[in-house]
């Protein structure tokens, strides 16, 4: 019963985030009645910030679980060499750092990067052997975050959609790995998404 309550609360929070901010997809049509029991900041920037912090909290819980259950606490050079994941990162040219900050360029890059991460989060959700509820929450809430950020990008054409065949390629890579490497791959995805979101959070705070 407690897990059901937690799940309902988490979903309610995500729906509140989505309905309280203009989104380009179906989420914009969700009922706002779910928002009545939860008080959230009123500005759009704060809503993005709160959602990023929510996702980071879920990632932290998953990483702790991987460390405790699967002994995946640190990266190894062997694992990095064998995982050709090309995970998104933020660089100086992306305009997200205080030096050379450019809001439009930064928003576009964060949105595109998170869309790329969605493919890796499919792997996480389908293959994670621990708390699947938290894994699903990371996947769902990242989708909502993409919609929230994309709605703020002025030139929508600059947001590039990942190649759909990449998902099948990533799944094939994972299936070819032994259990140790599978756990390492999931650990790397979580760690990289955490880093990406932490930099994104800093950028959102100066927008």
From Swiss-Prot:
GO terms for molecular function: cytokine activity; growth factor activity; identical protein binding; interleukin-6 receptor binding. The gene is IL6. It is found in: Secreted. GO terms for cellular component: extracellular space; interleukin-6 receptor complex. The keyword Membrane does not apply. The keyword Disulfide bond applies. Cytokine with a wide variety of biological functions in immunity, tissue regeneration, and metabolism. Binds to IL6R, then the complex associates to the signaling subunit IL6ST/gp130 to trigger the intracellular IL6-signaling pathway. The interaction with the membrane-bound IL6R and IL6ST stimulates 'classic signaling', whereas the binding of IL6 and soluble IL6R to IL6ST stimulates 'trans-signaling'. Alternatively, 'cluster signaling' occurs when membrane-bound IL6:IL6R complexes on transmitter cells activate IL6ST receptors on neighboring receiver cells. One of its GO terms (biological process) is positive regulation of B cell activation. Disulfide bonds join 67-73, 96-106. Pfam families: IL6. The modification Phosphoserine is found at residue 76. InterPro entries: 4_helix_cytokine-like_core (IPR009079), IL-6-like (IPR003574), IL-6/GCSF/MGF (IPR030474), IL6/GCSF/MGF_CS (IPR030473). This is Interleukin-6. Keywords: Acute phase, Cytokine, Disulfide bond, Growth factor, Phosphoprotein, Secreted, Signal. Component of a hexamer of two molecules each of IL6, IL6R and IL6ST; first binds to IL6R to associate with the signaling subunit IL6ST. Interacts with IL6R (via the N-terminal ectodomain); this interaction may be affected by IL6R-binding with SORL1, hence decreasing IL6 cis signaling. Interacts with SORL1 (via the N-terminal ectodomain); this interaction leads to IL6 internalization and lysosomal degradation. May form a trimeric complex with the soluble SORL1 ectodomain and soluble IL6R receptor; this interaction might stabilize circulating IL6, hence promoting IL6 trans signaling. Residues 1-20 form the signal peptide. It comes from the Eukaryota. It comes from Vulpes vulpes. Belongs to the IL-6 superfamily. Gene3D superfamilies: 1.20.1250.10.
